[in-house]
Amino acid sequence: MNEKNNAVNQAGRHTSAPSPAAGFEVLLITGMSGAGRSHAANSIEDMGWYVVDNMPPKLLVPLVDMMTSSGSNIHKLAAVIDVRSRDYFDDLSAVLSHLDDLGVKTRILFLDASNEVLIKRYESVRRPHPLQQGNRLIDGILEERDLLKNLKEHADIVIDTSALSIHQLSTKLYEGLLGSGPTTVSVHIFSFGFKYGIPIDADFVADVRFLPNPFWVPELRSLTGKDKPVSDYVLSSEGAEEFLDAYEKAIAIAIEGYAQEDKHYVTIAFGCTGGQHRSVAMSEALAKRLRARGLTVSVSARELDKRSAD
């Protein structure tokens, strides 16, 4: 058993031969109770990891085997591990060795906070510490800290959350896992028809009914904003490009702010009367502009999608 195995009892790694699981990543999220494991798990899930909460260590290997042998498109698994039970230390040591044999890259994230901060957090939610067992709150915290001491020393990433907000913790996680803070926001743009209801899940709603309606042009009526004749008609209309110029600038400013505030998904809706022509064309046009800025953008057409499903 190498040094890391001895420390988790101790979390070890060693080079192994290639296997179907080679290249798969496992992140173990652990640390002091009240230090922010749940918040960390949510942020890590936003980074594209498949997150499992309260995972017994001995179930990790079967789960990785299932994911890598079933052709799953999941390649990164984050598991919130509760290792307060001393038996779990032995389980975790054996599991890490087995994952190493499979060629899985494993890392341990340990979240910590000062005793004073942990006490304030527990008092604010009026819940007992899991190891308190009728004793003082500080006794439970000290017992857990002693139990996790070796694990913390051999963790790959240690974050003290004592003075961090949720947003700051998320930024720290990005830096620790990806090497940089969150700088991009994923954008989803969709079109809709006002006569079918205003969407309630959009961050921005643009009303483009001020543009001429292709519906009243006989040769365009049966087409949609995805068709070039309709798109050309809409975008060449007076005010269309000017509107897109202004809207693009406003959205770009907002996206920069969202990234700083740890908001990584933005939904923009374009509405016209029926959701077939103008809103579709304008959605596609804005998507093209934002992609040129290097943003990840997806586009959908609510009313057209409904029609296709019927």
UniProtKB/Swiss-Prot annotation:
PANTHER family: RNASE ADAPTER PROTEIN RAPZ. The keyword Nucleotide-binding applies. GO terms for molecular function: ATP binding; GTP binding. Disulfide bonds: none annotated. ATP binds at G31, M32, S33, G34, A35, G36, R37, S38. HAMAP family: RapZ_like. GTP binds at D82, V83, R84, S85. NCBIfam families: PRK05416.1 (NF003828). The keyword Transmembrane does not apply. It comes from Bifidobacterium adolescentis (strain ATCC 15703 / DSM 20083 / NCTC 11814 / E194a). Displays ATPase and GTPase activities. Belongs to the RapZ-like family. It holds the Pfam family PapZ_C. This is Nucleotide-binding protein BAD_0837. Keywords: ATP-binding, GTP-binding, Nucleotide-binding.
